[in-house]
Amino acid sequence: MASPLRLRSALALVTGAGSGIGRAVSVRLAKEGATVAACDLDRAAACETVWLLGGQGSEKVAPGGAHTAFQADVSEAGAVRRLLEQVQACFSRPPSVVVSCAGLTRDEFLLRMSEDDWDRVIAVNLKGIFLVTQAAAQALVSSGCRGSIINISSIVGKVGNVGQTNYAASKAGVIGLTQTAARELGRHGIRCNSVLPGFITTPMTQKVPQKVLDKVIGMIPMGHLGDPEDVADAVTFLASEDSGYITGASVEVTGGLYM
């Protein structure tokens, strides 16, 4: 049986924490006892998440041990480096749980997709996860700390999706990146896993036409879209020692879609 407060001593860094899956992950990790460093490109959104957790909402005033909001563009190496420095300065330790949820879509058919739309999605969804994974791992290794890194991919990274060449490529890359990181970092006591959501009710999927959603729902054996909390459940398991011998895994949270 899973024990309560499985993450009582953990410091968790969550990117994309201002909405959707990232916010749900932040809430769930906090309920399990973790202190959450909630990061988002939108500082106000990150602060709102921290307010929901009962924290301070700004890295400038939060004492060590309080849930705290941070702002960073994960596609920029300097910003990610500063983020890890700020988190460590605030809490006097590196995050032992790192969850990369930051992502975006710029959908278009392959024949019409612009180079800018391709580049931006790859920069945030794939390069951003590389930068966060690298910086977090460097901080953990230099401190001699164990950790769990969880990267949010997508089932689309395995099967593709019409109109999402850039998104599918970025999410497929996340799977390969995470598996390789798991091979390299295991000897340091750092586990790396990816979570592959299916169609989840988030601000991102709210842009999808209803007729498309109806078609997708008809393909899901469980008969409905997932909730962000469903993804948060999987992330929490991978963050905890309940999954202590799991690394390099890709956990699908899809309701059975594309089995």
Swiss-Prot record:
Its EC number is 1.1.1.n12, 1.1.1.62, 1.1.1.239. InterPro entries: NAD(P)-bd_dom_sf, Sc_DH/Rdtase_CS, SDR_fam. The modification N6-succinyllysine is found at K158, K171. GO terms for biological process: androgen metabolic process; estrogen biosynthetic process; fatty acid biosynthetic process; protein heterotetramerization. One of its GO terms (cellular component) is mitochondrial matrix. SMART domains: PKS_KR (SM00822). Substrate binds at S154. Keywords: Fatty acid biosynthesis, Fatty acid metabolism, Lipid biosynthesis, Lipid metabolism, Mitochondrion, NAD, Oxidoreductase, Phosphoprotein, Steroid biosynthesis. It catalyses: a (3R)-3-hydroxyacyl-CoA + NAD(+) = a 3-oxoacyl-CoA + NADH + H(+); 17beta-estradiol + NAD(+) = estrone + NADH + H(+); testosterone + NAD(+) = androst-4-ene-3,17-dione + NADH + H(+); 17beta-hydroxy-5alpha-androstan-3-one + NAD(+) = 5alpha-androstan-3,17-dione + NADH + H(+). It is an enzyme of class 1 (oxidoreductase). Gene3D superfamilies: NAD(P)-binding Rossmann-like Domain. Pfam families: adh_short_C2 (PF13561). One of its GO terms (molecular function) is (3R)-hydroxyacyl-CoA dehydrogenase (NAD+) activity. The modification Phosphoserine is found at S58. Pathway: Steroid biosynthesis; estrogen biosynthesis; Lipid metabolism; fatty acid biosynthesis; Lipid metabolism; mitochondrial fatty acid beta-oxidation. NAD(+) binds at residues 13-21, 40-41, 72-74, 167-171, 200-202. It is found in: Mitochondrion matrix. The active site is at Y167. PANTHER family: (3R)-3-HYDROXYACYL-COA DEHYDROGENASE, SHORT-CHAIN DEHYDROGENASES/REDUCTASES FAMILY MEMBER. Heterotetramer with CBR4; contains two molecules of HSD17B8 and CBR4. Belongs to the short-chain dehydrogenases/reductases (SDR) family. Required for the solubility and assembly of the heterotetramer 3-ketoacyl-[acyl carrier protein] (ACP) reductase functional complex (KAR or KAR1) that forms part of the mitochondrial fatty acid synthase (mtFAS). Alpha-subunit of the KAR complex that acts as scaffold protein required for the stability of carbonyl reductase type-4 (CBR4, beta-subunit of the KAR complex) and for its 3-ketoacyl-ACP reductase activity, thereby participating in mitochondrial fatty acid biosynthesis. This is (3R)-3-hydroxyacyl-CoA dehydrogenase. The gene is HSD17B8.
